[in-house]
Amino acid sequence: MKKWQLVGTTVLGASVLLGACGGGDSSGSGSGDGKDLKGEAKGEGSSTVAPIVEKLNEKWAKDHPNATISSGQAGTGAGFEKFIAGETDFSQASRPIKDEEKQKLEDKDIKYKEFKIAQDGVTVAVNKDNDFVKELSKDQLKKIYNGEAKTWKDVNSSWPDKKIKAFSPNSSHGTYDFFEEEVMDKEDIKAEKNGDTNVIVQSVEKNKEGIGYFGYNFYEQNKDKLKEVKIKDDKGKTTEPTKKTIKDGSYALSRPLFLYVKEKSLKDNDVMREFIKFTLEDKGKSAEDAGYVASPEKTYKDELKDLKKYDKKSDK
């Protein structure tokens, strides 16, 4: 059985070696069939997307013992920084690439391809003993996270006059960017921030007046310790995050999850190209195994069709 191995830790997060053990120079060779495939593809980015990549790799490594996928989970922003710097073949992202990131890639003449590999719902949760917060509107969430609401009573006059303890990912995370865009209208988030999502979960669990937000699978893994909060959308409809509401988009904080891959790596690195093909042919099963939601089947079909142009056989 393959094991995930910690190969390096930075102030941004842990880098995890996925798949077969062994070296590699971020290049790949071989026919693309199982044991003939040799080399490595390197990635970095979202801790939300990381569990999906790990699940994919558990399957991949069984038939590709000499093809290594190495990836970290330092956050979407940190992942794009390495992607732009030329240090990685792919970047995991829990938000779309920003215009300024696109420009930096364009300035370096780095072309890339976007793949939507799954769907997620950013989940808001409070302490398990909180018996009064059952739902929140986006406006109420904004008041909590911009510091306007200091106590629960400031959010709802019928709630206790107790100081709120708000927790958030830090700005290196795509979940932070998504929340800032969808909830905060780009206002600054005023909360205790952490780069480790597990620490945020633990903080909400330990603080009776705690509130936090994170990817759906982090809630799913800890739902015996936390209480989810239903979200009221702009039309006044209240919905809880479930696989169904995330898939049909009725949950107000639904979002796609991405892999961004350099076109050069798709053309020149057999390991990278075959892993992306493997990911799309998996049709979101690994995403479901990781606690997320598969993209519509048409998404995978269309992306597989687009991927064919990078196949070396198609150049002959």
Swiss-Prot record:
Basic and acidic residues bias (residue ranges): 33-43
GO molecular function: phosphate ion binding
CDD domains: PBP2_phosphate_like_2 (cd13654)
Signal peptide annotation: 1-20
InterPro entries for the chain: PBP_domain, Phos-bd, Phosphate_ABC_transporter
Principal localisation: membrane
Residue ranges of the region described as Disordered: 23-49
Pfam families tied to this protein: PBP_like_2
Lipidation (S-diacylglycerol cysteine): 21
Subcellular compartments: Cell membrane
Cellular component annotations (GO), alphabetically ordered: plasma membrane
Membrane topology reported for the UniProt record: Lipid-anchor
Keywords: Cell membrane, Lipoprotein, Membrane, Palmitate, Phosphate transport, Signal, Transport
SUPFAM superfamilies: Periplasmic binding protein-like II
One GO biological process term: phosphate ion transport
N-palmitoyl cysteine lipid attachment residues: 21
Compositionally skewed regions (Gly residues) per UniProt: 23-32
Cysteines paired by S-S bonds: none
Similarity section: Belongs to the PstS family.
Function field: Part of the ABC transporter complex PstSACB involved in phosphate import.
Subunit structure: The complex is composed of two ATP-binding proteins (PstB), two transmembrane proteins (PstC and PstA) and a solute-binding protein (PstS).
Protein name per UniProt: Phosphate-binding protein PstS
Species: Staphylococcus haemolyticus (strain JCSC1435)
